[in-house]
């Protein structure tokens, strides 16, 4: 699968910046097995947003794009979940096993934040990952395209 990169607008691991307070965030991934079951039943994609607290680009992506999309244009058409790259936050994986956010990030080879990966109910990637904030003018379009790719891959009708 082709990877889309914009390292100039992404935060690599170990970058020390002062933590910022999140003014916007998605629901944290806590039970991907339940999300996966809903995805399979409803034939809707799951958008996994990988971030770290010390990432100003993540804050902007959440505030300006992802949170509004999850509440408006994609409400009921996709499941949006946030995954912390750096912390072992407990989560139930797609197969029902207990794991952690940082382990999920490692499995998808996420090294930079923000990273967006659209998956199906089994956790399989359905579109090319979006790494970094990319060109701000087109970021919303990149997200829409990744979600539309997911919808097509799942054979879901557009709602």
Regions found by a protein language model. Name each.
Residues 1-25, 159:
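N-terminal targeting signals for export/organelle localization
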Residues 26-45:
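A short beta-strand-turn-helix
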Residues 28, 74-99:
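Thiol-based oxidoreductase modules, predominantly thioredoxin-like and allied folds used
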Residues 41-44, 63-86:
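Conserved helix-turn-beta segment immediately C-terminal to the redox Cys motif
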Residues 43-46, 51-54, 112:
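Short pre-active-site segment immediately N-terminal to redox-active cysteine/selenocysteine motifs
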Residues 47-48, 80, 116:
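Hydrophobic beta-strand anchors of alpha/beta hydrolase catalytic cores
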Residues 50-64:
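Conserved redox-active cysteine motifs that mediate thiol-disulfide chemistry
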Residues 106-153:
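Non-catalytic, surface beta->alpha helical segment in thiol-disulfide oxidoreductase systems
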């Amino acid at each position: 699968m082709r990877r889309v990169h914009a390292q100039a607008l992404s935060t690599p691991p170990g970058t020390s910046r002062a933590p910022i307070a999140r003014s916007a965030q998605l629901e944290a991934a806590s039970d991907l097995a339940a999300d996966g079951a809903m995805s399979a039943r409803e034939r809707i994609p799951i958008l996994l947003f990988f971030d770290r607290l010390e990432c100003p680009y993540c804050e902007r992506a959440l505030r300006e794009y992802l949170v509004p999309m999850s509440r408006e244009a994609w409400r009921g058409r996709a499941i949006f979940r946030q995954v912390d790259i750096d912390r072992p936050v407990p989560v139930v994986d797609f197969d029902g096993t207990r794991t952690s956010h940082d382990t999920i990030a490692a499995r998808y080879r996420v090294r930079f934040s923000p990273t967006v990966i659209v998956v199906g109910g089994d956790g399989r990637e359905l579109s090319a990952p979006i790494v970094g904030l990319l060109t701000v003018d087109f970021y919303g379009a990149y997200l829409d395209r990744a979600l539309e790719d997911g919808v097509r891959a799942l054979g879901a009708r557009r709602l």
